[in-house]
């Protein structure tokens, strides 16, 4: 694997790309990072992801792997000699996949709509977002990590969103630390890992980016 060529097409605010960077760091994989603005469909992005034309795209020896959750599994299988990401137990693995899908299918929409909407729609979105935060906190329970004692797949899946938490709080007018103390303790534990810290974007910079997006989409 020492001679492998690994390239990551990503955009700095992408929570999905942050996941992939965490996984690569956990495995100690060296890679070339190529900043790729998703609003500008570069020839390389179109070539590597012709169906969706979205980032992140992981390119391993010229072969593209799309979708962040798929990338996590790919990274875990290819670089299997260090820091397992997915549980080995089939049942626990299925649960991790279930909850990761919950994050992207249920949590994702209100996580950005909370800063992109106003009025009654905003109130409904905020309510939905808080319910999903509570669901995720309940699933965590008293475990150090979502997979138990070991940092892994589901932790990476949710921590990818961490850089956006502050924007969610600001525009949603709520406090994660106050309303979800167990989840807050978990985030602090995850932030002790170098792989996580180095993968995350600056939260204040994300807020500045949100203002740009609000203006772009007429939500300012």
Curated annotation (Swiss-Prot):
Residues 4-83 form the GST N-terminal domain. InterPro entries: Glutathione-S-Trfase_C-like (IPR010987), Glutathione-S-Trfase_C_sf (IPR036282), Glutathione_S-Trfase_N (IPR004045), GST_C_Tau (IPR045074), Omega/Tau-like (IPR045073), Thioredoxin-like_sf (IPR036249). GO terms for cellular component: cytoplasm; cytosol. Its EC number is 2.5.1.18. Glutathione binds at residues 14-15, 40-41, 54-55, 67-68. Keywords: Cytoplasm, Detoxification, Stress response, Transferase. One of its GO terms (biological process) is response to cold. It catalyses: RX + glutathione = an S-substituted glutathione + a halide anion + H(+). Residues 89-210 form the GST C-terminal domain. It is found in: Cytoplasm, Cytosol. It is an enzyme of class 2 (transferase). Induction: By alachlor, metolachlor and benoxacor. GO terms for molecular function: glutathione transferase activity. PANTHER family: GLUTATHIONE S-TRANSFERASE U26, GLUTATHIONE S-TRANSFERASE, GST, SUPERFAMILY, GST DOMAIN CONTAINING. Belongs to the GST superfamily. Tau family. In vitro, possesses glutathione S-transferase activity toward 1-chloro-2,4-dinitrobenzene (CDNB). May be involved in the conjugation of reduced glutathione to a wide number of exogenous and endogenous hydrophobic electrophiles and have a detoxification role against certain herbicides. This is Glutathione S-transferase U26. It comes from Arabidopsis thaliana (Mouse-ear cress). The gene is GSTU26.
